Design a protein with these regions (language model features):
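Conserved glycine-rich beta-strand-loop-beta hairpin in the small C-terminal domain of fold type I
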Residues: 268, 285-295, 307-320, 332
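N-terminal small-domain helix-loop-helix segment of the aminotransferase-like
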Residues: 10-94, 98, 272-273, 340, ...
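PLP-dependent enzyme catalytic core of the Aspartate aminotransferase-like
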Residues: 1, 336, 351-390
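Hydrophobic residues in well-ordered beta-strands that form the structural core
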Residues: 112, 133, 191-193, 267, ...
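Conserved core segment of the aminotransferase class I/II
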Residues: 212-285
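Short, conserved charged micro-motifs
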Residues: 325-330, 368-372
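Conserved core of the PLP fold type I
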Residues: 54-187, 198-217, 287, 368, ...
Length: 390
């Protein structure tokens, strides 16, 4: 008997990263695939003071004190907001789902970076979006291409990750942030700005969010505690311009009533506190060491195979292969060597037209195992390249 599924189910794609992580459960496998925080850096949390009342239903907007704390944090970054514009969500992934429901019908145009976050593409395309890709450069999007796209199309929104982008690790320059804000204002395009990695910075660089520079365009700004505290809490937030917030709140109510209050309570014990700042300092130093270990191993084993930039934050290296193999074809061979990685092709709107990229996570594999893991992966790529050239 044929099931009466919705039309959108024909666009439902499996998550490649979930499939890879499932295949990599053996303890001997070295995984450079996911964006998992290092388990050694998951902070010890205290539940002793959790009020019994947190077991009750809560407000769809989220806990008032947490909303106040997030609004204060955002204002310090230059985001013009009050607590009444903050919505606590079940991880910032839910922001993408809510924005998809708010804006996207079949054929709706959405502007994204090339490459962009894989799970955002999946959400937008599930709802029927036609994604318009603008190429990334080392300091942000190609501005000429961005202007040309906005002249020729009318996207419902632009989805951008300007600070240590996933997957490319690009951080937009100040000049690019100003220019992007100016273009979105000029063409009246809503901005969805995603900043899960802002706190994971390894140099002294900093840049105000793009939403803080907008003068006319509507906006949504989203973040999470998953990369700095505990991803298992499933606590994120969105802040939205006043014209969008009521619709996002109603969509949240219809999706899951409210984000879990126990996770919200725990997040509130950390945000803005001295022990949170101390934890962030330890986290940055820990990941800087792992970033440097991966840089050394890549220099040793990949210099003849790929090019890359040293990331100044986030959790990833983005490699461009000198011989543009379809990196998806390397997965099974790498797994046979007890190594997994994330192919770069699925991060593009047109995967088959963009072969030869790898995303490597440096947060999860211990520094002392990194060299061996990347040596094995380099050999897999070298062997595949020789086969293709033969």
């Amino acid at each position: 008997m044929e099931m009466a599924f919705s039309e959108r189910i024909t666009r439902l794609k499996s998550s490649l990263i979930r499939e890879i992580l499932a295949a990599a459960q053996r303890p001997e496998v070295m995984s450079f695939a996911g964006g998992l925080p290092a388990e050694a850096m998951l902070p010890a949390v205290d539940w002793a003071e959790l009020p019994a009342s947190m077991g009750q239903y809560g407000m769809s907007e989220g806990e008032p004190a947490l909303r106040e704390a997030i609004a204060a944090q955002a204002r310090a970054l230059g985001v013009p907001c009050e607590a009444c514009q903050v919505l606590i969500v079940s991880g910032s992934q839910q922001t993408l789902d809510l924005a998809s429901k708010l804006f996207i019908d079949s054929g709706t145009e959405v502007l994204v970076e090339a490459p962009t976050y894989l799970a955002a593409l999946q959400s937008f395309q599930l709802f029927g979006a036609h994604c318009l890709a603008v190429a990334q450069q080392a300091d942000g999007p190609d501005l000429a291409a961005l202007r040309a796209t906005l002249e020729q199309h009318a996207p419902a929104f632009a989805y951008l990750i300007p600070t240590f982008q996933n997957p490319s690790a690009v951080r937009y320059s100040e000049a690019k942030r100003e220019a992007v804000a100016g273009l979105l204002d000029e063409y009246g395009v809503t901005l969805l700005e995603d900043e899960p990695y802002r706190e994971l910075v390894f140099d002294q660089g900093s840049a105000r969010p793009i939403v803080s520079r907008l003068k006319r365009a509507s906006w949504i700004y989203t973040g999470t505690v998953s990369k700095t505290l505990l991803p298992g809490l499933r606590v994120g937030y969105l802040i939205a311009s006043a014209d969008l917030f009521p619709y996002l709140l109603r969509l949240k109510q219809s999706a899951d009533l409210h984000t879990n209050r126990i996770g919200q309570w725990q997040a509130l014990q950390w945000l803005g506190s001295d022990h949170y700042q101390a934890h962030l300092g330890q986290l940055r130093e820990f990941y800087r060491v792992r970033r440097d270990a991966m840089q050394a191993a890549l220099t040793e084993h990949f210099s003849d195979l790929a090019t890359w930039e040293l990331p100044q934050g986030g959790l990833f290296f983005w490699l461009t292969l000198k011989q543009p193999l379809d990196s998806r074809t390397l997965l099974n061979r790498a797994l046979a060597e007890d190594v997994v990685f994330m192919p770069g092709e699925p991060f593009f709107v047109e995967p088959d037209a963009n072969p030869g990229y790898l995303r490597l996570n440096f947060s999860h594999v211990a520094a002392e195992r990194m060299d061996e893991g990347l040596r094995r992966l380099a050999q897999v790529i070298r062997d595949a390249g020789a086969l293709e050239a033969a």
